[in-house]
């Protein structure tokens, strides 16, 4: 019984560390226009509760708009188009 618990904990921890250490594979074609104006992403700045604060932050750094995106809408994403 102890061996089963130990083996389970070891297996889960190894899978977790492998998931963190694995490089991301991105084989998608990149659009040249998308590369010219990358989005700026920062945590906080009002997200996820005050999207207007995120928008104001993006305007203050010279971007055209801002919105809350990402997991749980916790990242302020600024766009330029």
UniProtKB/Swiss-Prot annotation:
Protein name, per record: Fungal defensin micasin
Resulting phenotype, residue 64 to A: Important decrease in antibacterial activity
Propeptide section residues: 22-43
Signal peptide range in chain numbering: 1-21
Organism this protein belongs to: Arthroderma otae
Domain of life: Eukaryota
Compartments where found: Secreted
Keywords of the record: Antibiotic, Antimicrobial, Cleavage on pair of basic residues, Defensin, Disulfide bond, Secreted, Signal
């Amino acid at each position: 019984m102890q061996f089963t618990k130990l083996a389970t904990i070891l297996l889960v921890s190894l899978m977790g560390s492998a998931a963190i250490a694995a490089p991301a594979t991105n084989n998608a074609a990149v659009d040249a226009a998308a590369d010219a104006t990358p989005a700026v992403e920062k945590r906080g700045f009002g997200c996820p509760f005050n999207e207007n604060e995120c928008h104001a932050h993006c305007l203050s750094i010279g971007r055209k708009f801002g919105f809350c995106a990402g997991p749980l809408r916790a990242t302020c994403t600024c766009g330029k188009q």
